[in-house]
């Protein structure tokens, strides 16, 4: 199959049903909020960007699935407000993310998948240093693995869906690792995500909304998230309401000179969905 346009490719960090986690972002845009910590979920090259488009080829061979997604976009759209490690990113050219995925389903319920994503365009964006030299910041390569047990495929009423996800990002002056597990049963979803950020260089950041990261160091984010679905509201088969909430604890190895040692964040959302 060949697909061209603005869409999302294979999900390498599934959170089960409609889930609200503020730090994660929802598309290829604004995923990285400078100073807030980063929950990397293999989304940077997945697509549905408002600053570019996708070209995807895929093939199903028995119980194997192969996919290659190419995302072309303005790479600075990854960053909320265009900032990375306290610097404003300057676009030189578009990025091109290549994102190959391999998935294997030995049974109807169980699937294991592995993937990577990488920007293959050098000097796509960066900053100009004090000597007037352009410093590339667009080198980003991520790896991910996911295992899913979907009991709903054989038991639509009482089946359990469990996801175990891991992801690792190697970027300019930053290394990120994320692991998560979540389960869905009877329309109730509960999950936990651990994210570890290691930042090797930072120029400082100025913001008005309690920036948590403002220096190099190691940072950990622990997040619990939950969701519940009200199905077929008002006896309408395609109308569902989702309640989502999360709570995050952020801690660091800091010395309390460059910001707080810990912080917590939380949120809730109600989403109405009608499927035409």
Regions found by a protein language model. Give the residues of each.
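Outer membrane beta-barrel
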Residues: 1-73, 94, 103-106
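Outer-membrane beta-barrel pore domains and translocons
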Residues: 7-11, 60, 69-73, 97, ...
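Solvent-exposed loop/turn segments connecting transmembrane beta-strands
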Residues: 10, 15, 45-53, 73-74, ...
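Outer-membrane beta-barrel proteins
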Residues: 13-16, 66, 75-80, 121-127, ...
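Flexible, solvent-exposed loop segments that connect beta-strands
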Residues: 27-43, 79-89, 123-138, 200-215, ...
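Detector for outer-membrane/organellar transmembrane beta-barrel domains
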Residues: 62-63, 100-229
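Loop-centered beta-sheet repeat module
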Residues: 67-125
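Outer-membrane beta-barrel "beta-signal"
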Residues: 230, 263-276
């Amino acid at each position: 199959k060949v697909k061209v346009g603005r869409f999302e490719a294979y999900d390498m960090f599934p959170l089960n049903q409609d889930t609200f986690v503020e730090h994660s972002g929802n598309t290829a845009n604004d995923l990285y909020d400078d100073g807030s910590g980063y929950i990397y979920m293999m989304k940077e090259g997945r697509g549905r960007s408002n600053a570019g488009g996708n070209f995807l080829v895929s093939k199903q061979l028995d119980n194997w699935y192969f996919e290659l997604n190419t995302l072309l976009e303005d790479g600075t759209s990854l960053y909320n407000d265009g900032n990375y490690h306290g610097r404003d990113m300057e676009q030189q050219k578009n990025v091109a993310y290549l994102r190959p995925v391999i998935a294997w389903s030995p049974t109807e319920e169980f699937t294991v998948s592995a993937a990577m994503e990488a920007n293959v365009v050098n000097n796509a964006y960066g900053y100009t240093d004090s000597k007037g030299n352009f410093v590339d910041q667009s080198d980003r390569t991520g790896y991910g693995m996911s295992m899913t047990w979907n009991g709903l495929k054989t038991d639509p009423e009482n089946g359990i869906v469990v996801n175990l996800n891991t992801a690792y990002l190697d970027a300019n002056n930053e290394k990120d690792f994320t692991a998560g597990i979540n389960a869905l049963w009877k329309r109730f979803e509960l999950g936990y995500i651990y994210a570890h950020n290691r930042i090797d260089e930072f120029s400082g950041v100025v913001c008005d909304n309690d920036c948590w990261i403002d220096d190099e160091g190691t940072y950990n984010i622990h997040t619990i998230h939950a969701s519940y679905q009200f199905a077929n509201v008002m006896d309408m088969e395609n109308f569902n309401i989702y309640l989502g909430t999360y709570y995050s604890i952020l801690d660091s190895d800091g010395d309390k000179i460059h910001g707080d040692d810990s912080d917590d964040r939380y949120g809730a959302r109600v989403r109405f969905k009608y499927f035409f």
